[in-house]
């Protein structure tokens, strides 16, 4: 349900009534549910949308003249006032002739129908999305390292067995040859270097085309259908950028940024430079046609069966554009999910959430100490009504120092944190094999990055049993499928991080990848648990006796408890 809370008040002592009126954006018919006063001028209620898509709702309040009149009469009678001729005459005007008890019956209906001095809020909007927008496990892979679409299709049963809900593919389009990057981001590519998939566009086509090395259009369609049959949705990357060989460079030169001398300006995000990519110019005089073309790209893939999009750097494009595009796409395909790759300022991250993005990458990757995690999670809890995080433990661009130096225990700890803190989380291929060698000591880039070369991949990493078990736990424990029920638990030291999800699950993780750690986890009385209660570790099968108050834990490097409370 959509929960409603509002402050509703006016001068004087009149009794008020309030409702929430709501409808699908496509409909003109309003539905209605009452709001109830909860004290101190606060009102609350809810409504249950019946379909996916955008909904409009408005809060309406008015003076209930009938209830106000009856309340005044009752208070005067209670005070012993017997001469109520004037009040009775007023009541007869409102209710018609009759006794006081009859007036009370009439008032109950009239107070809803007669909306005296009615006022309304501005019309508000809510996006109603399917469960995958809130809860899901993501796996990212480069299809060229798996034998193209046919090879990826063969991996689907194993991905489904491991408990993944979404398979995210970096761009699958033709790759430009002009200024192509070589191995490890070399400025000059060798003849057999495949280039970066984010350098989109070549003689074979642009954003609506498929790289021929990955397979045919039929191969792609079969992959999407096979994924859906296995319960694994295919997510595509939507990157608004073009290689120098993209067809749009010739067809629409006015869509691109140029220097004063007229030369094209390649993309930069200092200190990073992308000589193989040109950005589109959202200030172009032909912006309307540009918007339409980009919208049509998404609609093209929607019509091919794709309903999930990871959007590359949306914070560097026009916010009104995104609001328009998402609304237009969802008008035809309301189940479409947009995942923002927006590592940026909080105001922009939350704005993208409010204008339609289903979920977002976060700064989780860089929060590794107890203090960092606590501060970060409290921030996200404040955003919970409108912002859904997706905790990726790594990406092709991000190999954090904690993983580089911490080894397998660090990978285990971060996996447990991501999978049990956030309803949506993800891993990029290689994480399960503990891949952790950077291109340089001070870099977060992988050496021999898959962005610039083809690897031979298979689902055979030693971390996969833990991945599978965590995904099983997530599916069987509903409290892990929500974020707003997170409660951080106190510990005495700095190396054990603990938290509860509702009153059903408690988690403790050793953040130290080098040393075993002992600590005390404090279960607060506010959780309302018994003085003593059993807990069952869903990872190890061990049972313990815990209590409200202090509880001892001892964990190996990177180790964790995922406790089922009361089991």
What is each model feature region?
Residues 1-165, 174, 227, 353-356, ...:
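Carbohydrate-interacting/catalytic domains
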Residues 194-225, 229-232, 242-459, 482-483, ...:
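Alpha-amylase-like alpha-glycosidases and glucanotransferases acting on alpha-linked glucans and related
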Residues 52, 61-97, 111-274, 284, ...:
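Acidic/aromatic-lined carbohydrate-recognition and catalytic surfaces
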């Amino acid at each position: 349900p959509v929960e409603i809370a509002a402050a509703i008040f006016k001068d004087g002592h009149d009794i008020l009534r309030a409702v929430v009126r709501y409808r699908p954006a496509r409909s003109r018919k309003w539905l209605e549910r009452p709001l109830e006063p909860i004290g101190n001028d606060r009102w609350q209620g809810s409504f249950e949308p019946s379909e996916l898509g955008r909904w409009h709702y408005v809060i309406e309040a008015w003076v209930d003249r009938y209830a106000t009149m009856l309340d005044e009469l009752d208070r005067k009678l209670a005070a012993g006032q017997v001469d109520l001729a004037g009040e009775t005459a007023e009541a007869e005007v409102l209710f018609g002739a009759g006794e006081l008890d009859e007036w009370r019956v009439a008032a109950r209906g009239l107070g809803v129908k007669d909306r005296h001095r009615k006022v309304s809020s501005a019309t508000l909007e809510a996006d109603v999305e399917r469960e995958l927008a809130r809860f899901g496990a993501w796996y990212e892979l480069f299809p060229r390292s798996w034998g193209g679409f046919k090879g990826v299709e063969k991996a689907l049963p194993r991905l489904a067995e491991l408990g993944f809900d979404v398979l995210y593919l970096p761009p699958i389009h033709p790759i430009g040859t002009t200024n192509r990057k070589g191995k490890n981001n070399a400025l000059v590519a060798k003849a057999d270097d495949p280039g970066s998939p984010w350098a989109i566009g070549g003689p074979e086509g642009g954003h609506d085309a498929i790289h021929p090395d990955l397979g045919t259009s039929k191969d792609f369609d079969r992959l999407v259908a096979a994924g859906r049959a296995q319960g694994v949705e295919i997510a595509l990357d939507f990157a608004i950028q073009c290689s120098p060989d993209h067809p749009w460079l010739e067809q629409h030169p006015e869509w691109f940024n140029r220097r004063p001398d007229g030369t094209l300006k390649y993309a930069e995000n200092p200190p990073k430079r992308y000589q193989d990519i040109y950005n589109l110019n959202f200030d172009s005089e032909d912006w309307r046609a540009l918007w339409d073309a980009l919208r049509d790209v998404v609609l093209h893939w929607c019509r091919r069966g794709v309903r999930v999009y990871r959007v590359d750097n949306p914070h560097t494009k026009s916010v009104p554009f995104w609001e328009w595009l998402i609304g237009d796409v969802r008008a035809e395909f309301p189940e479409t999910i947009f995942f923002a790759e927006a590592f940026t300022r909080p105001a922009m991250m939350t704005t993208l959430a409010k204008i339609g993005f289903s979920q977002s990458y976060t700064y989780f990757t860089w929060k590794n100490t107890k203090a960092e995690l606590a501060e970060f999670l409290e921030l996200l809890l404040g955003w919970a009504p409108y912002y859904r995080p997706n905790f990726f433990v790594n990406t092709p661009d991000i190999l954090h120092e904690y993983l580089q130096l911490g080894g397998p225990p660090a990978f285990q700890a971060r996996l447990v944190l991501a999978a049990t803190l956030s309803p949506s989380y993800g891993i990029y291929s290689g994480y399960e094999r503990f891949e952790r060698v950077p291109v340089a000591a001070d870099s977060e880039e992988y050496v021999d990055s898959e962005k610039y070369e083809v690897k031979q991949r298979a689902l055979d990493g030693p971390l996969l049993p833990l991945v599978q078990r965590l995904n099983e736990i997530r599916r069987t424990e509903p409290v892990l499928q929500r974020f707003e029920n997170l409660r951080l638990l106190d510990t005495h030291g700095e190396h054990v991080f603990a938290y509860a999800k509702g009153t059903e699950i408690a988690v403790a993780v050793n953040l130290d990848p080098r040393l075993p750690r002992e600590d005390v986890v404090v279960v607060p009385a506010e959780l309302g648990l018994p003085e003593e209660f059993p807990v069952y570790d869903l990872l190890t099968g061990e049972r313990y006796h815990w209590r409200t108050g202090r509880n001892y834990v001892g964990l190996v490097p990177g180790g964790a408890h995922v406790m089922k409370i009361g089991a």
